[in-house]
């Protein structure tokens, strides 16, 4: 499956600019943030495997687990697109072809762990790792029955709807988690990205 994340990349770039989020700040927290999301992905996959057993009595739980898997995958991809923003356009990373990509979640873990060895995220090695992380994310998404490009568009739409403010003291954008604020947020509908059986 061929995937073009150019528009998603541009949307994330606009969000960063609006919220005064620098690429350097994304680099600083990348490993911690992406490992947290990988933990959520592993947990969702574990739930999916449990709910997929023949003796499980609640089939709807499978769909919920799939949604959590796709959400975690997209979160990892968003973090990776943000931290690699300075190299992606020059290397045309937003253009992906998953036909030869591995779909092993352990491979994704290895790629993420290797990033911890980089002191900067602008050299060729980090570019290759970022590209491969996105490729594996796309393939995993496809494996669980979802179109990665459409899922990422939903994720970007949700992120752009979040409200908050830039804290001048910490120099960070802080999300407004108050209930009233959350009622205005868009919630990504990953079902819109589900691949119909005849399209697989």
Question: What kind of region is each of these model predictions?
Answer:
Residues 1-200:
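Flexible "arm" and connector segments at domain edges
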């Amino acid at each position: 499956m061929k995937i073009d994340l150019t528009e998603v990349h541009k949307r994330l770039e606009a969000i960063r600019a609006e919220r005064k989020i620098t690429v350097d700040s994304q680099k600083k927290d990348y490993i911690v943030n992406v490992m947290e999301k990988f933990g959520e992905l592993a947990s969702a996959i574990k739930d999916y495997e449990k709910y997929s057993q023949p003796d499980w009595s609640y089939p709807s739980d499978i769909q919920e687990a799939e949604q959590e898997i796709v959400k975690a995958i997209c979160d990892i991809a968003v973090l990776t697109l943000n931290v690699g923003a300075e190299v992606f356009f020059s290397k045309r990373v937003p253009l992906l072809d998953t036909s030869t990509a591995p779909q092993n979640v352990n491979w994704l873990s290895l790629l993420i762990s290797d990033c911890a060895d980089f002191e900067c995220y602008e050299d060729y090695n980090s570019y290759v790792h970022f590209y491969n992380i996105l490729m594996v994310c796309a393939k995993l998404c496809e494996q669980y029955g979802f179109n990665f490009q459409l899922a990422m568009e939903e994720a970007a739409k949700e992120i752009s709807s979040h409200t908050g403010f830039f804290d001048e003291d910490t120099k960070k954008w802080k999300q407004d988690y108050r209930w009233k604020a959350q009622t205005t947020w868009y919630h990504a509908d990953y079902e819109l990205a589900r691949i119909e059986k005849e399209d697989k």
